[in-house]
């Protein structure tokens, strides 16, 4: 027999671009939402816009524990250990998720804090080059992929809660193992930051380049406008996957350079790149509808469906007696 998991209050820790957008989107969906922000400016901005936000972390976590809220960690990676220590002390029984762009490193920190049993990793694959409360908006996640981890430890009830939050925010849920997420994020999220930085630096060294720069340069360097400390936090936390991805790019560029110098041609790279982009444009996305959360091998089924392009756009049912 299946059931629908109740949607608990949402406690957002960190009200920047992503956390602030979650607060807005979840509230718009009718969820009870409250949050914490370290800076007075961010918390005041949220309150001025009609949201429930304070700068007292202990008070926020006490409320989360009392209401059994789903805690959303929306702070930079370097701040995680300290934040997890506070959660372990004040709200250890609360379900827990995050929005960090790496998953294995976060899982390691959560495990070290003794909070693994109630944790399900998350990563909304969206954003802008801006940060802070004022950068967020309630529509940020509309039709965006939102990874929800299906690692072996995840509790089905907590997983359902995180899935429901993502859906309430307007996202499409992509189930994935943490290590597979990190490999993919290195290629499609973190490596583009390195390339954008390198391209911006290269152009800055060429006289007249900025005067001639137009759409292709603007699009290719958009994420270079991101605050350097945020870029470092996401990229350096995924070193194990980003370094080999960078090696692959360097190899491709080196081969193209050698071919250009020797034969006056970049045909191999241009053809391969065009073919890969065409595959991306036609990549199939199908709705995942047959998996029951908590049923036998449900995690493996969701991971396989995610690899194949499957997404969840409507809440999946859960067993009465999760496994």
Curated annotation (Swiss-Prot):
Family: Belongs to the prephenate/arogenate dehydrogenase family.
Catalytic activity: prephenate + NAD(+) = 3-(4-hydroxyphenyl)pyruvate + CO2 + NADH
GO BP annotations, alphabetical order: tyrosine biosynthetic process
Pathway: Amino-acid biosynthesis; L-tyrosine biosynthesis; (4-hydroxyphenyl)pyruvate from prephenate (NAD(+) route): step 1/1
Activity response to pH changes: Optimum pH is 7.9.
Entry keyword Aminoacyl-tRNA synthetase: no
Activity regulation summary: Is inhibited by NaCl; more than half of the enzyme activity is abolished in the presence of 10 uM of NaCl.
EC id: 1.3.1.12
The protein's role, per its UniProt record: Catalyzes the NAD(+)-dependent conversion of prephenate to p-hydroxyphenylpyruvate, with the elimination of carbon dioxide. Is a key regulatory enzyme in tyrosine biosynthesis. Displays no chorismate mutase (CM) activity, in contrast to TyrA from E.coli and some other bacteria, that are bifunctional and possess a CM domain.
Ranges where the Prephenate/arogenate dehydrogenase domain occurs: 8-291
Keyword line: Amino-acid biosynthesis, Aromatic amino acid biosynthesis, NAD, Oxidoreductase, Tyrosine biosynthesis
Pfam families: PDH_C (PF20463), PDH_N (PF02153)
A molecular function GO annotation: NAD+ binding
Enzyme class: oxidoreductase
PANTHER family for the chain: PREPHENATE DEHYDROGENASE, PREPHENATE DEHYDROGENASE [NADP(+)]
NCBIfam families assigned to the protein according to its UniProt record, in alphabetical order: PRK06545.1-6
Protein name as it appears in the record: Prephenate dehydrogenase
Thermal dependence of activity, per record: Optimum temperature is 37 degrees Celsius. Is not stable even stored at -80 degrees Celsius. About 50% of the activity is lost when stored at 4 degrees Celsius for 24 hours.
């Amino acid at each position: 027999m299946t059931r629908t998991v109740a949607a608990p209050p949402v406690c957002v820790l960190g009200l920047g671009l992503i956390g602030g957008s979650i607060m807005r989107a979840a509230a718009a969906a009718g969820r009870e939402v409250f949050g914490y922000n370290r800076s007075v400016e961010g918390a005041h901005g949220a309150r001025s816009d009609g949201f429930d936000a304070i700068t007292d972390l202990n008070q926020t976590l006490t409320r989360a524990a009392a209401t059994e809220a789903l805690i959303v960690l929306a702070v930079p990676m370097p701040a995680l250990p300290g934040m997890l220590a506070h959660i372990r002390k004040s709200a250890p029984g609360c379900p827990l998720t995050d929005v960090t762009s790496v998953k294995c490193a976060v899982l390691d920190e959560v495990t070290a804090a003794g909070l693994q049993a109630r944790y399900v990793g998350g990563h909304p694959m969206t954003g802008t080059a801006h940060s802070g409360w004022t950068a967020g908006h309630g529509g940020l996640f509309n039709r965006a992929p939102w990874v929800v981890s299906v690692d072996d430890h995840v509790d089905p009830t907590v997983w359902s809660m995180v899935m429901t939050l993502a859906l309430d925010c307007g996202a499409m849920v992509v189930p994935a193992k943490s290590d597979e997420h990190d490999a993919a994020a290195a290629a499609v999220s973190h490596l583009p930051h390195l390339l954008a930085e390198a391209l911006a630096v290269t152009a800055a060294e060429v006289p007249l380049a900025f005067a001639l720069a137009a759409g292709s340069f603007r699009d290719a360097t958009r994420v270079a406008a991101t605050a350097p400390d945020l870029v470092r936090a996401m990229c350096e936390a995924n070193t194990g996957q980003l370094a080999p991805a960078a090696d692959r790019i360097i190899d491709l560029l080196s081969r193209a350079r050698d071919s250009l110098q020797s034969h006056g041609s970049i045909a191999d790279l241009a053809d391969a790149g065009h073919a890969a982009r065409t595959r991306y444009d036609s990549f199939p996305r199908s709705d995942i509808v047959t998996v029951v959360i908590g049923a036998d091998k449900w995690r493996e089924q969701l991971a396989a469906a995610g690899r194949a392009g499957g997404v969840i756009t409507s809440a999946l049912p859960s067993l009465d007696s999760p496994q």
